[in-house]
Amino acid sequence: MNLVRTAMLLAFMTALFMFVGFLIGGRAGMMIAFVIAAGMNFFSYWNSDRMVLSAYRAQQVDERNAPEFFAIVRDLARNAGLPMPKVYLYDSPQPNAFATGRNPENAAVAASTGLLQALSPEEVAGVMAHELAHIQNRDTLTMTITATLAGAISMLGNFAFFFGGNRENNNNPLGFVGVLVAMIVAPLAAMLVQMAISRTREYSADRRGAEICGNPLWLASALGKIARGAAHVPNEDAERNPATAHMFIINPLSGERMDNLFSTHPNTENRIAALQDMAQGGMNVSTPPVRAANPSRKSRSVPDTGLGRGGSQPPKGPWS
């Protein structure tokens, strides 16, 4: 089913790219757009995960420089029956996390330094279990390709004026009106695609993540903290790359952005309520619960990776 969904997504994005090309340059523009879209589809399948990780300057960590964080992900992956993903940290005060990769064998999970500072180990386990659920459900390919192509489509729409704004351009069948339509429709359509693939996907990952970590309340508590943090702490890299917003566990964009009129995520309170109902109703756990390291302690520092505060001071707390 995921292969069909991904194929439909690629077909829609390609058609949208061709439509914008037609509005800008007529048939010639449409054919050029088709060639570009085909190349981007191929490139994004193999490289979009690296592009996303690079956009957030994420650094890979292991048991040497982030032993307890790495151990939590390792134990959760074992519970889920997944291959061990690559583990990354990116430097941002906003608590958040995402997963990427074209399949479970080539997957990665990334957490912000702010996440490790703000959440308890149990809550971190809930968050990473949610991200592993995306990997297990094979959502990451769809998420990552959408981020890459949506960003490209939005950029093409934003620069449509420069490519096709010449009123005397005979290749443009609709003239300046066509350019204006491309500038408005392309980013909006890309945004709607992100919305369409995010809603049910997040609920499904919440439920499976709760099963993987063994306690829905860990994830419920984490979602509340992350949502409050995202509302007050900006993520500058996400603001520069809004097409990646749907990849995060909570929308990283500030409330001041117009993009939030078309939220890429379901309401956080509804997600928390669903997890609480799951806990109260007696969760059918299919895997043994993970035991979070130092469960009574809150994170006060980040691993010694050179990110955040961990590079200059000896690390303290559960992530050292």
Swiss-Prot record:
List cofactor names only: Zn(2+)
| Catalytic class of the enzyme | hydrolase
The Enzyme Commission number assigned here is: 3.4.24.-
Molecular function (Gene Ontology), one example: zinc ion binding
Which keywords has UniProt assigned to this entry?
Cell inner membrane, Cell membrane, Hydrolase, Membrane, Metal-binding, Metalloprotease, Protease, Transmembrane, Transmembrane helix, Zinc
Does the keyword Cell inner membrane feature in the UniProt annotation?
yes
Coiled-coil segments, which residues? none
Annotated Zn(2+) binding lies at H130, H134, E202
In the bilayer, the protein is annotated as: Multi-pass membrane protein
Q: Where is the active site?
A: E131
**Cofactor binding annotation:** Binds 1 zinc ion per subunit.
- Location within or outside the cell: Cell inner membrane
Q: Name one Pfam family in it.
A: Peptidase_M48
Q: What are the start and end residues of every segment in region (Disordered)?
A: 281-320
One GO CC annotation, please? plasma membrane
Instruction: Please tell me whether the keyword Protease is annotated for this protein.
Output: yes
**Listed GO biological process terms:** proteolysis
Enumerate the transmembrane spans.
6-26, 28-48, 145-165, 173-193
> Which family is this protein grouped under?
Belongs to the peptidase M48B family.
This chain belongs to the protein called Protease HtpX homolog
Organism name? Rhizobium leguminosarum bv. trifolii (strain WSM2304)
Source gene?
A: htpX
